């Protein structure tokens, strides 16, 4: 149902706007300019944390309502989840995949000036590969769940995000101010879970509602983390991942339809 897809995407957009604003204010006033240590007594860390909780609750409620609609069919395969106009799928796949790949290339070119340059280069290469895999997935989602390349394409974001989580933790572990990088860690964790849930369509274990919830929540966190200070390539990669998660979950939600026969079809 396209209406449900627009509703949850609009909810995520509004929540992300507030989350980004609060995070930007926190970055501006809650950390000392010289040391980077947190300033005591500020309300903005609590505002950001509260916004994350509110986003999780709102998106969970919207997904719960979608799940409990009577006589509903849920997509149970990758082609069913990605069913859309070939033009829409191609434009989304090429644009978002290219953004992720360009972010990886940017990171690769500037990795020499960053902490752990070797890890940054590997991360950049994975981002380029994941961008190409996403574009391929949107251009040819496959006729069956085990179609050649479908599993690899669905697995690439998982590999990218798992490695990025390791890199982020290694780079930030020396920072005593956990709140300075906590949102990024949460965003990467949520995006990793979202990618895992979406990969279930390719692996024959589809869970449409879980995939939609985690994709929307992870996109919210990725957008909320954008005001943080990071390399330009990583910034573009994070924005591209948010776009990819929103696009995938929009298509999946659009393909939740009234069942043709029987009470409920597909996989919730």
Predicted regions and their residues:
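C-terminal transmembrane-bundle signature of multipass membrane proteins
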Residues: 4-7, 13-24, 46-61, 181-268
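Membrane-interface helix-boundary motifs at transmembrane edges
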Residues: 72-85, 113-115, 138-151, 200-209
